Regions:
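A Rossmann-like FAD-binding core segment of flavoenzymes
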Residues: 31-134, 197, 204, 217
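Short beta-strands and strand-loop turn motifs
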Residues: 37-41, 68-70, 146-147, 179-185
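Flexible, glycine-rich terminal cap/loop adjacent to redox cofactors
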Residues: 171, 187-198, 203-307
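Glycine/Thr-rich phosphate-binding loops of Rossmann-like dinucleotide-binding domains
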Residues: 23, 28, 111-114, 153, ...
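FAD-site-proximal beta/loop scaffold in flavoenzymes
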Residues: 1-10, 97-170, 177
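A short alpha-helix-loop-beta-strand transition element characteristic
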Residues: 66, 123-126, 173-183, 207-212
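Rossmann-like NAD(P)H-binding beta-loop-alpha module
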Residues: 6-48, 155
């Protein structure tokens, strides 16, 4: 695997600027490798709102030699002095670049067509996924499927929850996969985490929303930690004021997002969250303060006129 190498490459190319690619890039940069990243899309960390990703990008500007967006690798040739890679696109170098190691992190392809599921009568779609219902049951009533093979997002915590539902359903219980959100976390430095709907998804779906953003530059704990580059953002339905999404960028963002997940599942509104007493000084209280910002009652920031 990517972490079982016998030596640390001096110069490394990561193909793919998604979560896995950036996590591996962070690891090897920390170990001393000079890293280039190439990504076909116009931004890194697909799925996250740009404002979250931009904080990560600014903090890590010194880590990476070259980040090539709207660019792709077209050819790689192993020679005595390394791997010569040719690029094309908006940020493509004019000449081939030489690397000690190339890591391909462009996603995974489901293998439903390669496991002989058809011999059990289990349907597999054209992409290789196995379709299931809300109880994770396939078209064969006594066969269940969970995890990456049933579709996106390909995340371990989603698979575990699906496993619980499938086991309970198989035992005859009325258990269904009906979660309102599935959190995503990039274990980079800083971490980036989000749950529920993003701002981009709200805009695409025509959802009228409001948000509250609390900058960690105003967090006593973040300042004391020497890591105040992040922020906490909560997204609310503008009509009901119920939370529908949230994102956090900063140290331990993955640990903090759980409260946002629970708030979404419980249908909490901005008042529920802002009136929940959070311990001080902690990073977690930024969630309550973001709700205060959305409600127009935050006393830890200069007065803001509520829109």
């Amino acid at each position: 695997g990517a972490l079982l190498l016998k030596s640390i490459p001096k110069r490394m190319l990561v193909i793919g600027g998604g979560i896995i690619g950036l996590e591996m890039a962070t690891v090897y940069s920390t170990l001393g490798s000079r890293i280039d990243i190439v990504e076909m899309m116009d931004g890194l960390m697909a799925g996250a709102d740009r404002d979250l990703e931009k904080v990560w990008e600014k903090f890590n500007a010194h880590r990476f030699t070259n980040v090539m967006l709207k660019t792709r690798a077209t050819n790689a040739e192993a020679k005595k002095d390394g791997i010569h890679v040719t690029f094309e696109g908006e940020k493509a170098p004019s000449a081939p670049q030489v690397y000690d190691l190339v890591l391909v992190a462009v996603g995974r392809t489901p293998n439903g067509k390669k496991i002989n599921a058809d011999k059990a009568g289990v349907a597999v779609d054209e992409r290789g996924f196995i379709p299931v219902d809300s109880q994770l049951r396939t078209n064969v009533p006594h066969i269940f499927a969970i995890g990456d093979i049933v579709g996106q997002p390909m995340l371990a915590h989603k698979a575990v929850h699906e496993g619980h539902v499938a086991a309970e359903a198989a035992a005859g219980q009325k258990s269904y996969f009906d979660s309102k959100q599935i959190p995503s976390v990039a274990y980079t430095d800083p971490e980036v985490a989000w749950a529920g709907l993003t701002e981009e998804q709200c805009k695409t779906r025509g959802i009228d929303y409001e948000k509250g953003v609390f900058p960690w530059a105003a967090s006593g704990r973040a300042i004391a930690n020497g890591r105040d580059e992040g922020f906490t953002k909560l997204i609310f339905d503008k009509q009901t004021h119920r939370i529908i999404g949230g994102g956090i960028v900063g140290t331990h963002a993955g640990d903090l997002i759980g409260e946002v997940c629970l708030a979404i599942e419980m249908g909490a509104d901005s008042v529920d969250i802002r009136k929940t007493i959070h311990p001080h000084p902690t990073l977690g209280e930024s969630i309550g303060m973001a709700a205060e910002v959305a409600h127009g009652t935050c006393t830890d920031l200069p007065p803001m006129k509520k829109k």
